[in-house]
A protein has these predicted regions:
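N-terminal pre-domain/capping segments
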Residues: 1-108
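Flexible, glycine-rich active-site loops centered on histidine and acidic residues
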Residues: 112-114
Length: 114
């Protein structure tokens, strides 16, 4: 028997605040999402609190302590950049994002087009 689909929340309305330093911390958003009583949180790779890899295990533990998981990481690299060096930077950042996804326990790393 396969697992039933689960619901995960994505903070669409708070992306700008979660990307900016000193606006909304990932921990504050996790607490807000916990009130929805959902099993999962979809994350975005450019949230400010994800910049330091030392934060990844702490964030994962915080999510799990709240009774949730991170089933998917959302990323938006731009592989269409004509300049080879800049395009390689995007590839390298995506590799970094895949590593971050694994560290956070995400089973999927979704790549948005662009």
């Amino acid at each position: 028997m396969s697992a039933k689909p689960q619901i995960a929340a994505f903070p669409k309305g708070w992306i700008k605040d979660l990307v900016a330093p000193d606006k909304l911390s990932i921990y504050e958003w996790i607490d807000m999402a916990g009130a929805m009583e959902i099993p999962g949180l979809e994350m975005y790779n450019n949230f400010h609190d994800f910049k330091d890899p030392a934060n990844w295990p702490k964030i994962r533990r915080y999510v799990e302590a709240a009774g949730m998981t991170i089933p998917m990481m959302c990323c938006s690299p731009d592989f269409t950049i004509p300049d080879p060096e800049l395009r390689q930077q995007q590839v390298d950042h995506e590799i970094h994002s895949i590593r971050m996804s694994a560290e956070l326990g995400a089973k999927l790393c979704r790549v948005l087009s662009g």
